[in-house]
Amino acid sequence: MKILAKWLTLVVLLCTTPAKAALDIVITEGVDAARPIAVMPFQWQGAGAPPQAIADVVMSDLVRSGTFKPLDELGLPQRGIGALAQFDANAWTNVSAEALVVGSVKPYGADQFLVSFELIDLVKAQNQALKGSANPTELLMDSRQTVISATQFRQYGHRISDIVYEKLTGIRGAFLTRISYVVVNHSQKAAYSLMIADYDGYNEQMLLRSPEPLMSPAWSPDGRRLAYVSFENKKAEIFVQDLYTQVRTKVSSFSGINGAPSFSPDGKSLAVTLSKDGQPEIYVIDIATKAIKRITNHYSIDTEPSWYPDGKSLLFTSERGGRPQLYRVDLNSGKVTRETFEGEWNLGGSITPDGRSMIFVNRTNGKFNIARMDLSTRFMQVLTSTRLDESPSVAPNGTMVIYGTTHQGKQVLAAVSTDGRFKARLPAGQGEVKSPSWSPFL
């Protein structure tokens, strides 16, 4: 309970604005193929109305995962139940869903609420009903009870979604993560805003506003800091900003290009692109000491570095073969290996957290789309069919990619599952949105 309370406090520190969605989520493909699941509205055991409907958050999360499809509550049997003790397996024999989420909320002191939830195995329940047996304890896949405040309903809903997702898929849920992005609104004097929001667009927070471009936000592995490029001083500079204290540090301000920061897996260094010695090359900067090490040395452009999960290699984009392609450089030996060959261009790559795949922008027949390549088989799959796709960023559980694209003449964010089945757009209410970056687990 103490660990969860500490986690909820950290989340609230980051969520400093009212709970509203700055980015809409418009699902465009993939819901029909998702796995059916039942989510019952949580029983409210108090006067008036609860501060927020937790079940709505859970259902939205599961839909947006691309993996699950919550059934219409109006068609469910036993509407209104809030615990396994009220569950009747015989009533669920004709429901095509693998699990049921039930729960309750009741006041628990001043501005405190006790939230209980249970995950029930419907497949086992249906088997028990067919056999005429009854063993409720075998049906319980998970059960939690937590005291939260009125401001923590949405965050705890994401926590429940994480638990449900992991229990049913074996993959850690990423609903308690955040995204950073740049909003551009040329109707304002300070047209560029660096923003952070929950993964679903709620609880937006502005880190910086500037009349000059902001770009390339990148999260530290602990989720406490953000690196980005700012032109606020009329030149490209790289900053690292603490998201809790708001203190920021200038890491790189050389002449020419200072761009594409990427945190090392241990959070101590940044891989960056600098042109201080002539052509754009890849460097690694120690954040604490500012010590700098040159990694590549080639007459062609080298840019967009990202780290392999083990921290021993970098993936980067280079034109050394004549056109932009992705290369790997071993940080110990300096050996460079070309990684991509299909299509006209391949750029802006990163390695998935499990180290098994590469996500990048592929250009084929003049079209820029997000693609995935299996690093063992080298099989490449184009994931998107949107226009002018760029800046892909992978969720920390490796199941989804957020990226920038163009829709109806405007820059927007979009998301696609790493198997290509689920697709969604994330348009902003005002301005254009670009340069997304998905946080680590928080």
From Swiss-Prot:
Part of the Tol-Pal system, which plays a role in outer membrane invagination during cell division and is important for maintaining outer membrane integrity. Its main location: periplasm. One of its GO terms (cellular component) is periplasmic space. InterPro entries: 6-blade_b-propeller_TolB-like (IPR011042), PD40 (IPR011659), Tol-Pal_TolB (IPR014167), TolB_N (IPR007195). It is found in: Periplasm. PANTHER family: PROTEIN TOLB (PTHR36842:SF1), PROTEIN TOLB HOMOLOG (PTHR36842). It comes from the Bacteria. Keywords: Cell cycle, Cell division, Periplasm, Signal. The Tol-Pal system is composed of five core proteins: the inner membrane proteins TolA, TolQ and TolR, the periplasmic protein TolB and the outer membrane protein Pal. They form a network linking the inner and outer membranes and the peptidoglycan layer. SUPFAM superfamilies: TolB, N-terminal domain, Tricorn protease N-terminal domain. Residues 1-21 form the signal peptide. Belongs to the TolB family. This is Tol-Pal system protein TolB. GO terms for biological process: cell division; protein import. It holds the Pfam family PD40.
